[in-house]
Amino acid sequence: MYTQSLDIPGNVAPLDAAAESPEQARFDAVMAADGKIEPQDWMPDAYRKTLVRQISQHAHSEVVGMLPEGNWISRAPSLKRKAILLAKVQDEAGHGLYLYSAAETLGVSRDSLIDALHAGKAKYSSIFNYPTPTWADVGVIGWLVDGAAIMNQIPLCRCTYGPYARAMIRVCKEESFHQRQGFDALLSMMKGTDAQRAMVQQAVDRWWWPVLMMFGPSDADSVHSSQSAKWGIKRISNDDLRQKFVDATVDQAKVLGVTLPDPDLKWNEARGHHDYGTIDWDEFWRVVNGDGPCNKERLATRVKAHDDGAWVREAALAHEAKRQARAEQHAA
């Protein structure tokens, strides 16, 4: 969903200043042709490090992103909604696994990436550090959060790094379903009682501005986007993606019957887009830097789940060791 740390100062190594080599020339030719780099191909160290940071942050976000909604699995209002939510949370876990696998093709270990997350050295999307106090929040996550994720992720299907691009094709298909189920859940609530409609509106009020922050800092403050664009990692700027999302969401909100909490939101005929209010970037940076409503809770929950699941990983390794031993005996 979720690659905000690419725009955080200091997160990307500077480009090598060495004279261009034949390998660099081949890499540049692939970039110029808008081709694909595969794991066995030579690539600049800065390109590799940028991808490791982006893909690992994306993977961390998928895994941590299970928590706000997973909190509601046991309290879903119906068997149908519970089954849908179970499937969705399972999908998010799968997305994390796809993306960790893609990161591993760059020569890093999954354990090292997870250790960095648990130590607080790696980032995940700031959006998952907000609470989900009502069932309507689950629907709004599907509609707005996953809707913003789709807007961010579709261009990644054309990323120049092959394993990442291919993983994103499946992820985007599943995220599209998540967005539709979130909207459907809210639509059902909006057909209900006054209390249910009020609950939906309150959830929209809570999530609208944090969702707009998901696209990352304004282009003027995005220190690494230019190089990522040259490498074909970042295809569309933060502000352009945010604008596309706002334009698409306004009509959806009208169908749903909710009001987006921005008094400055209005159509600008001259621009052909909606104008919207000023985002509170101070809040964004507070949450990114660990001072959000749920940062400590989210990280503690992930660490506990990882520790509690150690026996599963150990059992899987023991089973694989036995399987290999039996295979060697049969081959002898």
Language model regions located:
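Extreme N-terminal leader/anchor segments
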Residues: 1-43, 47, 310-332
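Conserved alpha-helical segments that form or flank metal/cofactor-binding pockets of metalloenzymes
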Residues: 2-24, 88-116, 183-186
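Extended, helix-rich structural scaffolds rather than catalytic motifs
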Residues: 3, 7, 198-332
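Acidic/His metal-coordination segments adjacent to aromatic residues that form catalytic metal sites
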Residues: 36-56, 116-142, 159, 192-196, ...
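Helix-loop segments that flank and shape redox-cofactor active sites
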Residues: 42-47, 65-87, 149-164
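Alpha-helical scaffold segments that form or flank carboxylate-/histidine-based iron centers
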Residues: 47-58, 77-95, 138, 163-175, ...
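Internal, conserved structured core segments that host functional sites
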Residues: 130-181
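Glycine- and acidic-residue-rich phosphate-binding/metal-coordinating active-site segment common to enzymes
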Residues: 159-209
